[in-house]
Regions:
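Charged, compositionally biased, marginally structured helical/coil segments
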Residues: 1-122
Length: 122
């Protein structure tokens, strides 16, 4: 992925490819894409440990209505998305090596295949 690639466009492409993989019943691609998209989504999440002002009643200061619990997600740069995908690839490669040393060749090949699928988005 180059610095000119929009993270939102990349995620949209990955989601579209996930739909294609689901229709084709390609379990390896489904697994790789779901975890990569989830990793990006998790990185965009906001810190939930932000303290709220203390209140004396159960609902003091509470707001009600549609969307009151929503906050804007963090915006990731292309470099951050690249690092997230690179970490996904590195994790799969390391686990594939570990599985291979344990004699589980098929599992190692599956993880390497997932790493290749994610690498196509870099």
């Amino acid at each position: 992925m180059t610095s000119a690639v929009d993270p939102h466009a990349l995620r949209a492409t990955m989601r579209a490819d996930l739909g294609v993989a689901m229709k084709a019943r390609n379990s390896r691609a489904i697994s790789a894409l779901r975890t990569a998209i989830t990793a990006i989504d998790n990185a965009e999440s906001v810190d939930s440990t932000v303290a709220t002002a203390p209140a004396s009643a159960h609902i003091a200061g509470a707001t009600i209505g549609l969307g009151t619990a929503e906050v804007p997600r963090r915006s990731l740069s292309p470099a951050q998305v690249h690092a997230i995908l690179r970490a996904q690839i590195d994790d799969r490669s390391a686990e594939a090596d570990r599985y291979e040393t344990l004699g589980q060749i098929e599992a190692a090949e599956g993880l390497r295949g997932e790493a290749q699928i994610i690498a196509a988005y870099l």
